[in-house]
């Protein structure tokens, strides 16, 4: 009978009803003149709505303090699920805007990150009438891009780690507003070191990067016209072989694909399959090499070739890997094999 009396309560309990639980944050500006947007849900007698608070200051921590002065309750970031960063802001040292989130034990390290094109306010205005939280909306949106192999999955934790890695560079989802003021994927933002280079990959190149990186989501599609007819395939399996020498890294890819769209007849004909395989091989190889040229131009080793060189060919690795990466010959050779042509065969 005495045991319950000896038990103590949770000394660090924090009730959501006493906090403004922020799910989405957006940054724009630069250190010395930072603006941040904080979105959190608020229940009224009629509906659930999203409140957006703007803070200004010289740093992310200062901005947070400024925003706290405008809320009726203390802001709680324990349910933060998405962080948006303007493209101009990301061209500075990105870690300056993330540092404070690693220093508070109550902050999650799993939020999604994305670079946005245009005014930050538009991305927050969109969510004000949503029933779900703002952060949830963008979290699901980015997760959908990951599942379709359009972007490489990164969280606050994994992205933060890469910013300290000198043998691989970060790539983040690049999002813009479409004509109907809805967010849409605009490709991938390429980083070199801790800063956004201003260079991007389009969505088709995003799929190719995921194939090259062997980081496929639920589905990876390649689509084109073949002899005037639509042709679409799903990448089923990727085999990759990398050969390293002092001034060249050769990458060989073997793709096993499944045909998901091809209205023409005779798909079971062996010669037809061979012709399509050659068409896809030429297409993917050409576009892969074009994508690699863009990565090298941006000095952005997005697939971590530097890690492979550092681990297995130490004498070829240089501390300024970004510069070395941009000067290497990196030919990519592709072989596409059709392993399935339809649902039943």
Q: Which stretches of residues belong to each language-model region?
A:
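Membrane-proximal alpha-helical signals and transmembrane carboxylates
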Residues: 1-345
